[in-house]
Amino acid sequence: MRIRAERDDLADVLTRAGRAVGSRSPLPILQGLLCEVEGGRLQVTGTDNEVSVRTYLEVEAIEDGATVIPAKLAADAVRKLPAGAVSMTAADGEVEITGNGPRFRLRELSVADFPTIDDTLPADTVDVVGETLVKALSQVGIGASGDEARPTLTGVLFEENDGGLRLVATDSYRLAVRDVLGIGATGSKLVPYRALRELGRTVGDGPMKVALGDREAVFVTDRGRLAVRIIDATFPKYRQLLPDSYPNRLEVPKVSLLDAVGRAALVAEDHIPVRLNLHDGGIELSVIRQEVGEETEHIEGVYTGEEMTIAFNTRYLTEGVSAIDSDTIILETIDALKPGLLHGEGDEDFRYLLMPVRL
């Protein structure tokens, strides 16, 4: 195998495919990238046996063939070469990477040992605007847990909802729901968020085909293919947590709320909540940390309902408000012990349900 390509283009396809490679895998082959060249096209594949990423690049193909190269080292080596054309040649158990002087020789891994990746796309595919899906996943993904000991909570639920797609994630402290109109879906599948987080950075955000199969979810664009193993678990019943109406409602500018919570977080630690006193005329935020001090401020807003004080984790509150794509934030509550619902003014496509902290 021998190719020539522009340094930045080659580094890009190696880096994007390398996002699927597990750095801690006990199998050396899973720390490599499969590079295949045929007909002027380079295809690069990385996998950890649960997530696979395949990227493509048109190259000057001097000789077709295949090799497996160390993922991180190869991508870093190409990136460190001088700008311009780069050559990559595989022969006699080594891969030589050269460009305008510098030369790397890397040990080749066995192509025969690399896992077989099925390129077949399931029959039921949906065409989506990749940018829309990537944005929706970035919003709802804040609710997913990072605790691998609870795999059910590490995923994003894809399910049909009124002819469209609904995305749902929860870590048991908060629930994020995003409805995406114009994207059809059938059934429901639970997909690991750690892989979905890489969607835009691996295959891009252009026109996309999405297929949710029995074993894996597949996302394909003209820049690449991301396949993720489905989580075989039952997602928590969440609909009962979303009441049809709330008796208390606050409207407040997003920037003002974010700035105020940010100042409160300077005093608070992760386990110390910010208190929100909701009353006619707005909201009073306060945080008290006995050994350090306190911070208090008032934000003007529109409030209807009974005066009440509710407390939230500062980080969870900040992440939820930041994810809302609106200049005005709506906070709806039932009482100080039940979850509060955050969404944008006139927009409930994204909803963020946050458990309060008991005072």
What kind of region is each of these model predictions?
Residues 1-359:
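Structural preference for solvent-exposed beta-strand-turn elements
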